[in-house]
Amino acid sequence: MNKIQHISFITKKNPLVSYERVGALQNRFVQHYLNYKANKVEQPPKPTIITSQVCPVYTLGRRESSINFTKGFPKAKVVKALRGGQTTFHGPGQILAYPIIDLKSFGLSPREYVSRLEQAIIATCKSFGIEKAHTTKNTGVWVTENDKIAAIGIHLRRNITSHGLALNVSTDLKYFNYIVGCGLYGKNTTSFKDQGVFTDLKSVEKVLVNNLDSFLMSK
């Protein structure tokens, strides 16, 4: 049984949700943690993971003020995010996973936290036969030195995590052609489908959440 509470927006009836709606729920959980730390509420919050598949959107990192598309203007919204990192794309065929936990409770540094996110993603990829999944000097999970399958961008406030990871399962990769993903020139984005693995989001979501639970909840 998972130690972490899981809330999923990925359903057959409503497979897509707005990025803003996911963010609003995430902020509610973060605020609960902050209120608890400030002794404003007695009930401690539960460690939580929110997973979703959002409508097409480009998000800017907190240090960016605008986006420069490399060619034309794609049909997608542009939204400012609090996470670290630079511009990336979120949309159909991609799993967004936002863990909301107190790093201090688990004795994790921000660097160790990111490392555990990467380990959970790698374990998930390998469960579906993508054995080449690995880390490099650049944050995220890669299948070659130039092909990234998952991006990571986090935000911390009083050791409370928000935002998290984006894992490409069957994402339409053309959206990445309009940007320099995460500010990394000469790098590409790949997906399970692009790697010859054809599966559905719910199957990958289940394995990913179990792996995140295993890697994040162990002290």
Swiss-Prot record:
Site (Lowers pKa of active site Cys): 148
Xref: CDD domains: LipB
Residues annotated as the enzyme's active site: 182
Domain BPL/LPL catalytic: 43-219
A Gene Ontology cellular-component term: cytoplasm
Record EC number: 2.3.1.181
Keyword Lipid metabolism: no
Domain of life: Eukaryota
Keywords attached to this entry: Acyltransferase, Transferase
Residue positions binding substrate: 83-90, 151-153, 164-166
GO terms, molecular function: lipoyl(octanoyl) transferase activity
Cited InterPro entries: aa-tRNA-synth_II/BPL/LPL (IPR045864), BPL_LPL_catalytic (IPR004143), Octanoyltransferase (IPR000544), Octanoyltransferase_CS (IPR020605)
Catalytic activity field: octanoyl-[ACP] + L-lysyl-[protein] = N(6)-octanoyl-L-lysyl-[protein] + holo-[ACP] + H(+)
GO BP terms in the entry: glycine catabolic process; lipoate biosynthetic process; protein modification process
Involved pathway(s): Protein modification; protein lipoylation via endogenous pathway; protein N(6)-(lipoyl)lysine from octanoyl-[acyl-carrier-protein]: step 1/2
NCBIfam families for this protein: lipB
Family: Belongs to the LipB family.
Function: Catalyzes the transfer of endogenously produced octanoic acid from octanoyl-acyl-carrier-protein onto the lipoyl domains of lipoate-dependent enzymes. Lipoyl-ACP can also act as a substrate although octanoyl-ACP is likely to be the physiological substrate.
Additional observations: In the reaction, the free carboxyl group of octanoic acid is attached via an amide linkage to the epsilon-amino group of a specific lysine residue of lipoyl domains of lipoate-dependent enzymes.
Name of this protein: Probable octanoyltransferase
UniProt organism field: Schizosaccharomyces pombe (strain 972 / ATCC 24843) (Fission yeast)
